[in-house]
């Protein structure tokens, strides 16, 4: 992000980083992953605070999506996958393009010009249950 700062100052650009509910929820056995994702949220919030005066918005998407990694996990541990899926209020993992992508497009657009430093949970409502 620091390397892009001079260009972003000129263009008043948007930064969209990706985090994970693993850090927010504290999933067991995921300490290293959760720490890395929370570091992304932390540095993003600092950048939002420091760079807002330059017209740069910095936000974070925390998705729960049907990614290739999730599909591999579903094949390896179908019972656990189904247990997690069944607890998502909307009943499914998000579609990468239709669900997650549209939020990213919104955050990159002028329609989100007054949103910065926020973590947008795109997880079918699963985090609200914890």
Report each predicted region and the residues it spans:
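Active-site helix of classical SDR
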Residues: 1, 36, 44
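Active-site loop immediately N-terminal to the catalytic Tyr-X3-Lys motif
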Residues: 12, 25-31, 53-54, 91, ...
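Conserved Rossmann-fold SDR core element
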Residues: 41-44, 51-67, 71, 115-122
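Short-chain dehydrogenase/reductase
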Residues: 29-38, 94
């Amino acid at each position: 992000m620091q390397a892009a700062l001079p260009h972003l100052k000129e263009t008043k650009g948007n930064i969209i980083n990706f985090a994970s509910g693993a850090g927010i929820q504290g999933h067991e056995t995921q300490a290293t992953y959760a720490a890395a994702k929370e570091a992304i949220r932390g540095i993003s919030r600092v950048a939002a605070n420091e760079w807002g005066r330059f017209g740069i918005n910095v936000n974070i998407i925390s998705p729960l999506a049907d990614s290739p990694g999730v599909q591999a996990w579903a094949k390896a541990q179908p019972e656990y996958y189904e247990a997690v899926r069944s607890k998502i209020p909307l009943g499914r993992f998000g579609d990468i393009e239709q669900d997650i992508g549209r939020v990213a497009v919104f955050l990159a657009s002028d329609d989100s010009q007054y949103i910065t430093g926020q973590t947008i949970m795109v997880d079918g409502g699963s985090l609200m249950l914890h």
